[in-house]
């Protein structure tokens, strides 16, 4: 019998596996083609140099694949470190940093002047074209002051606590993002906003990401965290929730602590027009790609 395969190279299983993965990603790329995906970047992923470089490459890949990624970043630990270096004591209430005039200036410096530019540089180094913004640029995030309700045990009544220059989005003006996206540039946004009377406000990054995702009609909002996602009473990951189910879990006490404001952001975003939100484990390598381009996912998906 003649050797018809003479000279043929044996198949490399690892190369075939890579080809299969790329092929399986095609329908997901088609689903998100020219769609906006907002990624809130923070936590361990942002503090780890290797994960940070991988994150930048993944975001550039999204852009090359036809998606329109928008990155919104946090920076709480870096702000705390700078305040400590300057001898300024940090105070918190309900997870929010009480922010006086001196503190908000440092917050803006760290978020918009340091962290933002580092992320932009990483994206550009990975072969992308990125530009850094904060909510003050183009009046992107118009902010209003936040007052926090606290229970006074002596009078047994709720009082309003003045958090200083801590705000929340009142309005998003997305025109500047439309212009940037049409130029094939990746916007990187620091969560600093400006009030109608010109004051600068420190805003929670999850909240800013959610408001921008709703204003842009995003297909997905991804919140990178340092946890696996939303956990049930048995401690196991809940892979998917409807808005109604998420509200029920908060009401019955299954969800507590820092996960509550994240779920509230998810709910508001979905009700505001975002197709789905994912609380994503940012410690997982290539978590963004796994979530968008495979059936695997890496967290909890919330949708209507």
Swiss-Prot record:
Keywords: Amino-acid biosynthesis, Arginine biosynthesis, ATP-binding, Cytoplasm, Kinase, Nucleotide-binding, Transferase. It holds the Pfam family AA_kinase. The record marks 40, 262 as: Transition state stabilizer. Substrate binds at residues 75-76, 97, 202. GO terms for molecular function: acetylglutamate kinase activity; ATP binding. Pathway: Amino-acid biosynthesis; L-arginine biosynthesis; N(2)-acetyl-L-ornithine from L-glutamate: step 2/4. InterPro entries: AceGlu_kinase-like_sf, AcgluKinase_fam, ArgB, Asp/Glu/Uridylate_kinase, Glu/AcGlu_kinase, NAGK-C. One of its GO terms (biological process) is L-arginine biosynthetic process. Catalyzes the ATP-dependent phosphorylation of N-acetyl-L-glutamate. The keyword Repressor does not apply. This is Acetylglutamate kinase. NCBIfam families: argB. Belongs to the acetylglutamate kinase family. ArgB subfamily. Its EC number is 2.7.2.8. It catalyses: N-acetyl-L-glutamate + ATP = N-acetyl-L-glutamyl 5-phosphate + ADP. One of its GO terms (cellular component) is cytoplasm. It is found in: Cytoplasm. It comes from the Bacteria. It comes from Parvibaculum lavamentivorans (strain DS-1 / DSM 13023 / NCIMB 13966). The keyword Transmembrane helix does not apply.
């Amino acid at each position: 019998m003649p050797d018809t395969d003479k000279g043929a190279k044996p198949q490399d299983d690892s190369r075939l596996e890579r080809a299969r993965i790329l092929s399986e990603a095609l329908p997901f790329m088609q689903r998100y083609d020219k769609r906006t995906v907002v990624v809130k970047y923070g936590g361990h992923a942002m503090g780890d140099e290797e994960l940070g470089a991988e994150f930048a490459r993944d975001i550039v890949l999204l852009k090359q694949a036809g998606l329109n990624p928008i990155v919104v970043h946090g920076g709480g630990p870096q702000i705390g470190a700078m305040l400590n270096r300057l001898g300024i004591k940090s105070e918190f209430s309900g997870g929010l940093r009480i922010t006086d005039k001196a503190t908000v200036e440092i917050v803006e410096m760290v978020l918009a002047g340091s962290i933002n530019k580092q992320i932009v540089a990483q994206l550009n180094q990975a072969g992308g074209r990125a530009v850094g913004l904060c909510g003050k640029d183009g009046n992107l995030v118009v902010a209003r002051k936040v007052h926090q309700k606290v229970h006074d045990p002596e009078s047994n009544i709720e009082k309003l606590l003045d958090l200083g220059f801590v705000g929340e989005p009142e309005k998003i003006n997305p025109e500047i993002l439309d212009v940037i996206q049409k130029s094939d540039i990746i916007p990187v946004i620091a969560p600093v906003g400006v009030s109608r009377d010109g004051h600068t406000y420190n805003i929670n990054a999850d909240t800013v990401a959610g408001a921008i995702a709703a204003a842009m009609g995003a297909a997905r909002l991804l919140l990178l965290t340092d946890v696996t996602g939303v956990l049930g009473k048995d401690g196991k990951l809940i892979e998917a929730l409807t808005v109604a189910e998420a509200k029920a879990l908060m009401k019955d006490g299954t969800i507590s602590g820092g996960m509550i404001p994240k779920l509230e952001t998810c709910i508001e975003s979905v009700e505001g027009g975002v197709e789905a939100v994912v609380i994503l484990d940012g410690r997982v390598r290539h978590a963004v790609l796994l979530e968008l381009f495979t059936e695997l996912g890496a967290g909890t998906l919330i949708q209507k």
